[in-house]
Regions:
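Outer-membrane beta-barrel "beta-signal"
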Residues: 273-287
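Gram-negative outer-membrane beta-barrel transporters
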Residues: 1-130
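Extracytoplasmic gating/loop element in the C-terminal half of outer-membrane beta-barrel translocons
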Residues: 112, 118-210, 217, 242-274
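Residues that define the transmembrane beta-barrel architecture of outer-membrane proteins
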Residues: 35-37, 97-101, 195-199, 275-279
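Aromatic sugar-binding interfaces of carbohydrate-active proteins
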Residues: 215-251
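Outer-membrane beta-barrel translocator domains and adjoining extracellular loop/strand segments
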Residues: 66-72, 132-138, 231-236
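Outer-membrane beta-barrel architecture
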Residues: 42, 54, 104-106, 202-204, ...
Length: 287
């Protein structure tokens, strides 16, 4: 509530600045509607000779008004990628995973009478969550020290943008083509982090306990088998936590965006610890 609109850019984007104090926030419910669509499919079958399998697919297209990634009002406000800082519009949710495939294959057999041996493989492949490419917020809101305004992609002879002498036009064009952006403002979380895949393996062997009705088993779990075989495989990815500012920009007196410098930044964050393979050997007793 401490910022008021003082003008617009040549694109019609509102420009805000502090008018009544600084960093005063009023939390209320939005009058905008965020929508979501999701569905899932599962197929499975069990065979009488000990084999069973399952394959599933899930699709999600979910919006939110604010991802609420912080425990404080200030950073929740500052970290939202948007072009409307007051009463922001719905956008693709930071937590949206568009596509996820899961599969399980298991086989059990009694090689020793009364004691089952079983091997189970679990696999998933999922698309990364979305994140936003942004430009500078200088001259677009009070402070504006951290860029969080959605990137504007100029078209040919676009009068909304002035390019500075240090701006790498060729690198920027290559970036736009790689990311698949069209002319105009990119959408919030329009692009996604890289896909991740993982294969886990579990081997169980039932064993006698000689303790009445109790049961025992020895198990071996291998998490991320692909990474165990090849350390360049099975890598786990997530979207960068913060929006990625690729253009250092400001607004001139005519309301045009001035693109000063370009920095190529991707949206994908490698989760190193989760990408490592792990093996566990244990004994389980059930009384």
């Amino acid at each position: 509530v401490s910022q008021e609109q003082i003008g617009v850019t040549t694109t019609g984007q509102p420009i805000f600045d502090y008018a009544t104090g600084r960093d005063n926030f009023m939390l209320t419910n939005s009058d905008r509607e965020a929508k979501s669509t999701s569905f899932s499919l599962v197929a499975r079958h069990d065979y009488d000779f000990g084999l069973d399998w399952m394959v599933g697919y899930a699709f999600t297209d979910a919006e939110d008004i604010s991802p609420m990634t912080s425990s404080t009002a200030g950073s929740n406000f500052d970290n939202l990628a948007t072009n409307t800082i007051v009463n922001p519009e719905p956008g693709i949710s930071n937590y949206n995973t568009p596509h996820r495939i899961t599969a399980r294959l298991s086989y059990g057999k009694e090689f020793f009478a009364g004691y089952e041996s079983r091997i189970t493989a679990m696999f998933y492949r999922k698309q990364g969550q979305g994140q936003s490419h942004v430009m500078g917020s200088v001259d677009l809101e009070g402070d504006g020290a951290f860029g969080r305004h959605l990137l504007y992609v100029p078209g040919p002879n676009d009068g909304n943008v002035v390019v500075g002498p240090d701006f790498d036009v060729a690198a920027f064009q290559a970036f736009i083509e790689r990311e698949g952006y069209g002319q105009g403002f990119v959408d919030r979380n329009e692009n996604n982090a890289a896909w991740s895949s993982r294969l886990d393996l579990r081997i169980d062997q039932e064993i006698p306990t000689f303790l009445g009705a109790s049961k025992g088993r020895v198990y071996l779990k291998i998490y991320n088998v692909m990474n165990m075989i090849d350390d360049s495989k099975g890598l786990q990815y997530d979207a960068q936590f913060f929006s990625q500012q690729v253009v250092d920009s400001n607004v001139n007196a005519q309301g045009q965006y001035v693109f000063n410098t370009f920095t190529d930044r991707g949206l994908t964050d490698l989760l190193e610890n989760q990408s490592l393979w792990e093996m566990r050997l244990g004994i389980q007793f059930e009384f």
